[in-house]
């Protein structure tokens, strides 16, 4: 209850975090000074990525070598849309294996998402030209096809484009 109020994270996550004093202390250190989306992102990383890593490796949190500051850094990258959730997963695994800072991992591996509309619009235009049938389906009311078009944009950008921004640009171009 205290974690939920203090950091604004979802109740289920707060309960899971509070269930273990070591995990709760780790979360609180990682989320210090954060609230809202960034704090929830830390909670998600601790509850999902960290818990899965600890279970798979059979290592206790205190012996994992993963620091709260590393999780906070990864959470900030994810919350700011600098990386996608898939890239956060990849970054977490690399961080756990190497002990490197997530910023360094993201930069060395070229994982940072492109979130510049000016850079992504030409890709959107190419995809819409190549997928004229799907574009027409969208205009005719089949809005589910947007997922396919976002996927084509992601493929064309080799995973570097921000999918949320592609979605917005596609919808704007198709309206």
What would you call each of these model-derived segments?
Residues 1-175:
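Charged, compositionally biased, marginally structured helical/coil segments
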């Amino acid at each position: 209850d205290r974690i939920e109020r203090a950091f604004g994270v979802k109740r289920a996550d707060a309960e899971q975090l509070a269930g273990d004093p070591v995990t709760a202390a780790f979360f609180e250190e990682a989320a210090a000074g954060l609230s809202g989306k960034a704090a929830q992102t830390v909670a998600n990383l601790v509850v999902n990525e960290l818990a899965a890593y600890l279970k798979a490796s059979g290592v206790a949190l205190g012996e994992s070598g993963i620091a709260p500051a590393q999780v906070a850094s990864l959470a900030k990258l994810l919350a700011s849309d600098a990386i996608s959730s898939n890239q956060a997963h990849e970054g977490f695994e690399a961080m756990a294996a190497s002990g490197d800072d997530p910023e360094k991992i993201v930069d060395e591996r070229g994982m940072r998402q492109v979130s510049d509309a000016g850079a992504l619009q030409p890709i959107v235009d190419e995809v819409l030209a190549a997928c004229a049938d799907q574009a027409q389906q969208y205009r005719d009311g089949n809005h589910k096809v947007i997922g396919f078009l976002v996927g084509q944009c992601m493929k064309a950008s080799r995973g570097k484009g921000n999918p949320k921004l592609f979605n917005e640009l596609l919808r704007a171009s198709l309206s």
